[in-house]
């Protein structure tokens, strides 16, 4: 069950609080500022993960968020954590504005998961991951594409099933949970639009404005 994730994540709260206290102590010990900043980033990241999983067990509140700013923030975070051989491109700028109802923490997890899947598909080769946004009168479409190895046709109908994974480690919940977040919590759609190793693999998110 997805809700088991909530149970397993709750014990993180206490060690995170402890880490925050230790960080304050280290600040008084004249530890290098760069080290403290990295520790602070990691604690913030753990807090974000805890927040995301705590929302999965109940219907999260959706607030008007600038989609372009959200996507830009995610891209900035991921660019420093993936291979330099991989380029992340987009067809928008953070200065653009498009406000739609979102649970920002859960939505960012979906995009991160799709991008990380693209990174895995590209493997150690040079590659391009694109995040492109288009609009209609009522909907917003977000395409996440890559030029990696693609998904075999025999697997394309089951990729959203719990347990599907191409990794040696992991529970295979990524795409299944992403679909649940988009479709159950945001009332949108997440589909595999196409996958061709000679061209592109494209995942499409459709959200209401």
State the predicted function of each range.
Residues 182-183:
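Detector for a conserved hydrophobic position within an alpha-helical segment of the HATPase_c
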Residues 18, 33-85:
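Conserved DHp (HisKA) dimerization/phosphotransfer helix of two-component histidine kinases, i.e.
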Residues 186-195:
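Glycine-rich ATP-binding loops of the HATPase_c
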Residues 128-138:
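Short beta-strand/loop element within the Bergerat-fold HATPase_c
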């Amino acid at each position: 069950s997805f809700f088991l994730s909530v149970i397993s994540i709750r014990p993180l709260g206490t060690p995170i609080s402890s880490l925050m206290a230790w960080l304050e102590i280290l600040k008084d010990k004249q530890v290098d500022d760069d080290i403290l900043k990295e520790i602070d980033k990691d604690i913030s990241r753990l807090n974000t993960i805890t927040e995301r999983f705590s929302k999965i067990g109940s219907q999260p509140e959706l607030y008007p968020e600038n989609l372009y700013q959200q996507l830009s923030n995610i891209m900035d975070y991921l660019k420093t954590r993936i291979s330099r051989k991989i380029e992340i491109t987009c067809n928008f700028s953070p200065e653009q504005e498009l406000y739609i109802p979102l649970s920002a923490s859960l939505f960012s997890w979906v995009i991160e998961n799709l991008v990380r899947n693209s990174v895995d598909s590209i493997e150690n080769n040079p590659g391009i991951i694109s995040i492109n946004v288009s609009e209609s009168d009522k909907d917003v479409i977000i395409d996440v594409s890559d030029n990696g190895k693609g998904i075999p046709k025999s697997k394309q109908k089951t990729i959203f099933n719990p347990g599907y994974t191409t990794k040696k480690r992991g529970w295979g919940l990524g795409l299944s949970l992403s679909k649940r977040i988009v479709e159950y919590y945001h009332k949108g759609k997440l589909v595999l639009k196409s996958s061709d190793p000679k061209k592109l693999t494209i995942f499409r998110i459709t959200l209401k404005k």
